[in-house]
Amino acid sequence: MTGPLLPHVPHDMATFGWPSSNPLRLAASNLAFPRSRISSRSKTATESPDWQGASGCLTLYYGHTDAEDMMLTRRQALVRSAAGAMMGGRASFARASQPATPVDFEIPANACDCHTHIFGEPDKFPFWPGRSYTPESALPEEMSALHRALHMARVVIVTPSVYGTDNLATLYGIEARGANARGIAVIDETTPERNLDAMAMAGVRGIRLNLATAGQTDPAVGRQRFRAMADRVKRRGWHIQMYTSLAVVSGIKDLVRDSPVPVVFDHFGGAQAALGLEQPGFADLLELVRSGRTYVKISGAYRSSSRAPDYADAAPLARALIAANADRIVWGTDWPHPNSNTPAGRAPTEVTPLLQIDDGRLLNQLAVWAHDPAIRKKILVDNPAQLYGF
């Protein structure tokens, strides 16, 4: 049922336990600085207790100038300032939703929510000026509370469109969750290789092409961007995650079949529940899933269906995808449920409230879509472990 895929990058869990030999720390002396400066910095880089995790690789990610050699960059200072605010036990939270309905089936150990976002406090994690909407904040401790309620041990954090190619909020979310987190970044043709190196060490395992939020449905654009990104990530064993329409899926089907990297389609591959199983492009998506070349996230059901709270019309789509190849399906909440459609009369720079979605009830639909616990274990545990290298 499964086609050949590039092997995932193996991960030594000690990497995330912060021993003195942590590759993130070693990267500071090996890659981030010219050799003429290693002697003045390598001891600090390898011994400082805050040189670890995603924050520990930021020197590699952003680099230094000679003038900044013996001081924190502004970016690092912001991150370390954010550490106190975001990991110091804040008493007040933002308005991100929490589950109202208890989970009504047994969640297997090491289950993974494969689609989430972090929206940091704007003064510490500024938004991209070209964004199409502005969300409320949604912080790592809120996400942790969500996952305790859902019995999710692992998480994948995806850089949302509002940050452009700035992946700092995602890296910080990974840092907050440690060994149980992976990330999906957004890059472009100008992103330096050293940034990709740093993000790989921090736990990033793929890059996202988001065509849907910008309303881009031209398959020609999808083909061009897909080719460019596949060339960037193929040597790393990463994958390409796409948020797009079924029209684009059909338009790039041949590229996906021949792709040197795995491909993941977000949110039911762009299928719309109201249009049913015969909608244009859905057969192409099923074909790619059967081939083993493509994963699909049965995530954010409310983006495919308007029939809240159970999204009953999404069930045939989910069941068809699972039946096509259960080894290529993963699940996600899409927490904190940003409303990417700015209301009429509101500027994209004005804050649009997060959607209030009951993720407990949403997760309970997985047992409706997949009755067999063994299939649910594949979707929640085994497939994410393979795809993201847990």
Regions from the PLM with identified roles:
Residues 2-9, 15, 36, 40-42, ...:
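Short, intrinsically disordered low-complexity segments enriched in Ser/Thr with adjacent Pro
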Residues 9, 31, 49-72:
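N-terminal secretory signal peptides
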Residues 16, 56-58, 91-112, 116-119:
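C-terminal segment of N-terminal export signals and the immediately downstream linker at the start
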Residues 69-84:
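N-terminal secretory signal peptides and thylakoid transit peptides that target proteins
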Residues 94-102, 278-390:
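H/E-rich (His + Asp/Glu) clusters that bind or coordinate divalent metals
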Residues 112-116, 155-157, 183-185, 207-209, ...:
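Hydrophobic faces of well-ordered beta-strands that scaffold small-molecule active sites
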Residues 129-177:
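Alpha-helical scaffold segments that flank or form the walls of functional sites
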Residues 162-247, 254-257, 290, 295-309, ...:
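Active-site gating/metal-coordination segments in enzymes
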